Amino acid sequence: MLAAITQVLNQNSDTQVDVCMTSEMARRIELWTAMYEDNAPWVDRKKVKSAQLPAAIASEVARLVTLEMKSEITGGSSAAYLNDQYQKKVLKNIRRYVEYGCAKGGLILKPYVTKTGLAIQYVQADCFFPLAFDDSGQIQQCVFTEQFRKGQKIYTRLEVHTLQGEQIRITNRAFVATNDYSLGSEISVNAVDRWSE
């Protein structure tokens, strides 16, 4: 996935990037994902069986990390509202998402506003690629990926976030492919119902 993303983003001079993740790290995250999902490449179900240890270990670490976890948002006039949303929507299910983060090597919480309030998208390490950092190590640009299959087609959305001063510029691009080896042809984001909002 990393190579396909890099190739697509570097086709256009407006989006030239140097992905801040090595292909080796991307391969490791893919391996950790496969191991967690009980699809490790060395398991053949006949001679080599899985003990499902990656999922068990990630679950136990997440349990220990969140067992007595207390967290809240304080300060400012909007803190009470934000804390209420945070308690209901983030902390309520935090153990499950910490488990995914432990299993795959990372997790990003991406809040956004909906008609009914705040919502949180939990982006796992295999769907997030940092593109640029500042001198203090803060992410300045990244790409989030979302992918799904419908029939024989694979749809992919790249959501590039670029920090520009105090604002974030978000660019969405959509692609459709018939194989796992490339992102395929670029299509309008509005051509896909779930992304047309």
Regions found by a protein language model. Name each.
Residues 1-121:
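Extended, helix-rich architectural segments
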Residues 7-10, 98-197:
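Structured, contiguous alpha/beta core segments that scaffold functional sites
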